[in-house]
Amino acid sequence: MFHNFHILSLSSYPILIFCSSLGFTSSLVVFFKNGIFGGLLFCLFSIFLVSFAWGKDIVMEGLSGYHNFFVMDGFKFGVLVFIFSEFMFFFGIFWTFFDAALVPAHDVGGVWSPIGMHLVNPFGVPLLNTIILLSSGVSVTWAHYSLLSNKGCANSLMLTCILAVYFTGIQLMEYKEASFSISDGIFGSIFYLSTGFHGVHVLFGGLFLFFNLLRLLMSHFNYNHHLGLEFAIIYWHFVDVVWLFLFVFVYWWSY
């Protein structure tokens, strides 16, 4: 039946996402305090698993014809609100960073970056990661325009997913070789908090793109109907922009 509103069925996914997110933040505090990592990984896996199951059900609703243009407009608004909430999250992190950097405390020597910190050279691994992430932005845009032109875009979308995995691997290598930890003062805390949460967003965005790649291979998209892929692309560009700010201020300016 045609209608101009979205009829929601009963679903356990919102409460499951809530519980997983609450567990993630709680286990993050436990990890910072006691170094116990298992709960953090379990809750993160739970978030990904519930998100995948929820997304699968939404896809099945769309393929069954339940999503008209009014419903899709609601999805668009929801994604914009979600992106705005993510923006405010990173805005809070950058607020903390600039509060510490522009008015350094006496216990860090009154200068920024703190005295005695051996920072990561921004023109080494961070610059390489910047090139990788910007290249992934180009490849995902290429995939989008190829689809709009009614051409194949699976290769460029696959390339984007590979670059996401490459970025994550290099980021983990950087953490392993860094000479400071999250416990080394305000800079160490902000550095690992900002880049770590960005890394989680890269992981989530890469899985989102891979999920849409599978849908593309199953012929769920065409040049006129690919809303899920557009959401993934918008999210990925947001991740790109956040990394540019991290590179310029947390890596380069602090160095």
From Swiss-Prot:
CDD domains for the chain: Cyt_c_Oxidase_III
Catalytic activities: 4 Fe(II)-[cytochrome c] + O2 + 8 H(+)(in) = 4 Fe(III)-[cytochrome c] + 2 H2O + 4 H(+)(out)
Q: Does the keyword Translocase apply?
A: yes
- The residues forming a coiled coil are none
MF terms from GO for this chain are: cytochrome-c oxidase activity
Domain of life of the native organism: Eukaryota
- Location, primary (coarse class): mitochondrion
Q: Which Pfam families match?
A: COX3
Q: Can the keyword Ribosomal protein be found in this entry's annotation?
A: no
Places the protein is found = Mitochondrion inner membrane
Note the SS bond partners. none
Q: Which SUPFAM superfamilies does the record match to this protein?
A: Cytochrome c oxidase subunit III-like
List the Gene3D superfamilies.
1.10.287.70, Cytochrome c oxidase, subunit III, four-helix bundle
Q: Name one GO cellular component term.
A: mitochondrial inner membrane
Query: Into which family does the record put it?
Result: Belongs to the cytochrome c oxidase subunit 3 family.
SUBUNIT field: Component of the cytochrome c oxidase (complex IV, CIV), a multisubunit enzyme composed of a catalytic core of 3 subunits and several supernumerary subunits. The complex exists as a monomer or a dimer and forms supercomplexes (SCs) in the inner mitochondrial membrane with ubiquinol-cytochrome c oxidoreductase (cytochrome b-c1 complex, complex III, CIII).
Q: What protein does this entry describe?
A: Cytochrome c oxidase subunit 3
The gene name reads: COIII
